[in-house]
Amino acid sequence: MKKGSKLILILLVTFFACLLIFPTLKWYFLMSVEDKKISSYSQEALRDYSKKKALNDLVKLKELYNKDPNSSIPASLSYLIPIAKNNYRSSMKIPPNIFTAKTLREGFLTDSDMGEVSLEIYRYYENIKKGKSRIIHLGLDLSGGMSVTISLDYSSVEKKLGRSLTFAEREDAIYRIMQILKDRVBRFGLTEPKIVREAGGNKIFLDIPGEKDESRVSTLLSGKGNLTFYVVDDESTSLLHRKILEAGSLFSIPEIQASMNLPDSKQIFPWYVKDSYGVDDESSVRYYVVDASPENSFDGAHIKDAGVSNDPRTGRDTVAFSLDVDGSEKFFKFTQKNVGKSLAVVMEGKIKSVAGIGYAITGGNVSIQGDSFDKKEAQDLALVFKTAAFPVDIKIDDLRIIGPTLGARTIDLGIKASALALCLVFLFICVYYGLSGVVAGFSLVIYNVFLILAILSAFNFTLTLTSIAGLILTMGMAVDINIVIYERIKEEIREGRRFENAFEAGFKKAFLSIMDANITTFIAVLFLTLLGTGVIQGFAWSLSVGIVASLFSSLIFSRFILEFIISVRKSKFISISWSSKYAKSN
């Protein structure tokens, strides 16, 4: 490869590596602890925080205006300026070039303006949360938290079906359980977890950083879910709506329910409209009375699968789901008895959808067509059907709590050990190989580590003590690459070749040996990556990425630097040993 091509390749790789590693650097070194904490809130908690902060900041702006209308805008309120500019333009006004308390205050005159501020705050933290999918995370041994190993038990389902589950059915069950766990973790407001499955196995590993309450996690994992179909009591629902109107804005559902003298079998559930934050809007809710008696309800645990389809006759999106054999028969009797009535889909005490029963449904294939379904709403409802209940039984095989003190201690020791190892490697190669060693040390200890961390960031890698060990081992292997190259160059010099020729021949003849050794190691590591679990997989991942980065750093980057140094030196020579024999040109 020509020097120009090498330079272009190095610049491209470095540019993309900078893009990949920036989110990690931003998260750990540029972002405040407060922002990190807030970004881990659940959607509901983040919405409430955004509204509260928007209100407080607008109050601060008003106080600033009352104190001195011409005062400058503090940094904490500077995020309001772009919103104010949009408000000026929406009012057909020209925004000022420089904002003061007076001009900024004039950009927020209506209640809807506060909503815009709240949304801007919400989007800011949502973007931080999304950015976490592109950073290197600290494992539980470094950050502390809880580690849970979950195994799947297919026996009860297979006994019920009278046959063994197919490979596709098992894979679907694992996928659905992982989706359920993600959904439940978000509802419980826990820190974003790491949920991975055992390669080729029936285990799921759930790591929750910072969590120490065993009872909360046990509650999260307990139960199969409670998606239920209820028949709507239209007469009682109409009465409920009238009483809500009579009571006005300060109505109380428990008081209204008591005044209606409803029997125990009749229950009231809310149906929330999603707000602009994508969460339930407390101010936009409609209540329904349902008949919760066993004969007028259907257990959603019978749902096998769900998806979104399009009705060719109406062009509307529909949510279709299929039932197991037992559920098909029960659902037929259930719908046959209630033709012409409304059906409410209830999960976690909230109505997810209401649809009419047009006819008795046979065959276990059901479709729901809402009057105002859009694609997103249909997909959300399908996900509710798929993830409401664990499709198979689960059990906790192992639950471990790692304290933050241990995490802090292991971080400190890990950083010290890594730094010491890198310094010793750098010192050795510099002393033994002279200026060539300095170039190799820079390319391996600095550029190589930079590439490895950039690649691991792209894969949302979780850094553990074992993966750190893999990185240190990678440094040693990278040094081996340069040792092979330099020793080969020295052999060529001993055979009487000029340095320029020995340099080219050394790299060329060492190439095959280097590739053979690293490809062999990479194949072994690849199997550990695919088949290993937990700490073994983390070690294998860091080692495999390190091999690729080390080859590029040694064969492309360090060679280009050496060639550049040689080209600008009059002697056309560079030291490759502490020995005077190789310290001057032939």
Swiss-Prot record:
A cellular-component GO term for this protein: plasma membrane
Transmembrane stretches, start-end: 7-27, 418-438, 439-459, 465-485, 521-541, 546-566
GO biological process terms, semicolon-separated: intracellular protein transmembrane transport; protein targeting; protein transport by the Sec complex
The keyword Magnesium is assigned to this record: no
Record-linked HAMAP family: SecD_B
Family recorded in the similarity comment: Belongs to the SecD/SecF family. SecD subfamily.
Protein name: Protein translocase subunit SecD
Source organism of this protein record: Borreliella burgdorferi (strain ATCC 35210 / DSM 4680 / CIP 102532 / B31) (Borrelia burgdorferi)
